[in-house]
C-alpha cells in the first residue's frame, strides 16, 4: 500500500510520516530526497523544483506493490492508495515557518494556501481516497492514532473537517496584502 502524506509546509508531514511508517512497518520515503536522488528535482535558490509527472512515473515504477509512506508537499500528485492531507491552523503554520527562516513572501504564500484549502483541493482533483486530518493542538502520536483509526475503518473519504475562513482576521498580519 502506498500512503501519501501531504499538506502545507509546517503542517507536520515529516514528523507524522516517519512515525506512521514506523507504526505500520512501512518504508519511509521523502519525496524531496527521492526527486533529488533521481535527478527530477533541482535546487532553485532556497526551494526545490520537482517535475511532478516524472515523480509520478518514478513512484509508479519503484514503489508499486510495496508498503510505503511518501512524505512531501507534492506527494498528493503521485499514484497512492490513500492520501492523507495534514492541516494546521494558519497561525501555527506561520509560527513554524517563521522559526524555519522562511521569507515573508513564502510565509504569506503558505499561510494563504492553508487558509483557502489549496492542497486539499489539489488532492481531491487527483485522488479517489483522501483523508483530511487536523493536527492543531495534537501531538504527532495523536495524529498517527487518528490516521490509523481511519485506515483500519476503511474510510474512503474524509474532507471538510476544517474551515479556516473565520480565522482570516487572526492571520491577516502574516499575509502580504498590497505588497509585491
UniProtKB/Swiss-Prot annotation:
The keyword Endoplasmic reticulum does not apply. Coiled coil: none annotated. InterPro entries: Adenyl_kinase_AK6, P-loop_NTPase. Residues 30-50 are annotated as: NMP. It comes from Thermococcus onnurineus (strain NA1). One of its GO terms (molecular function) is ATP binding. This is Putative adenylate kinase. Interacts with uS11. Not a structural component of 40S pre-ribosomes, but transiently interacts with them by binding to uS11.
Amino acid at each position: 500500500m502506498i500512503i501519501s502524506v501531504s499538506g502545507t509546509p509546517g503542517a507536520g508531514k515529516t514528523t507524522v510520516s516517519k512515525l506512521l511508517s514506523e507504526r505500520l512497518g512501512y518504508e519511509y520515503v521523502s519525496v524531496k530526497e527521492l526527486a533529488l536522488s533521481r535527478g527530477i528535482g533541482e535546487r532553485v535558490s532556497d526551494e526545490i523544483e520537482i517535475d511532478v509527472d516524472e515523480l509520478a512515473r518514478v513512484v509508479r515504477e519503484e514503489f508499486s506493490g510495496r508498503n510505503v509512506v511518501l512524505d512531501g508537499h507534492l506527494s498528493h500528485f503521485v499514484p497512492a492508495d490513500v492520501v492523507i492531507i495534514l492541516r494546521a491552523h494558519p497561525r501555527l503554520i506561520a509560527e513554524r515557518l517563521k522559526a524555519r527562516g522562511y521569507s515573508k513572501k513564502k510565509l504569506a504564500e503558505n499561510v494563504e494556501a492553508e487558509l483557502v484549502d489549496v492542497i486539499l483541493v489539489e488532492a481531491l482533483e487527483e485522488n479517489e481516497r483522501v483523508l483530511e486530518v487536523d493536527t492543531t493542538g495534537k501531538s504527532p502520536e495523536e495524529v498517527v492514532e487518528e490516521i490509523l483509526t481511519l485506515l483500519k475503518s476503511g474510510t474512503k473519504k474524509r474532507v471538510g473537517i476544517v474551515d479556516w475562513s473565520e480565522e482570516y482576521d487572526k492571520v491577516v498580519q502574516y499575509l502580504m496584502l498590497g505588497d509585491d
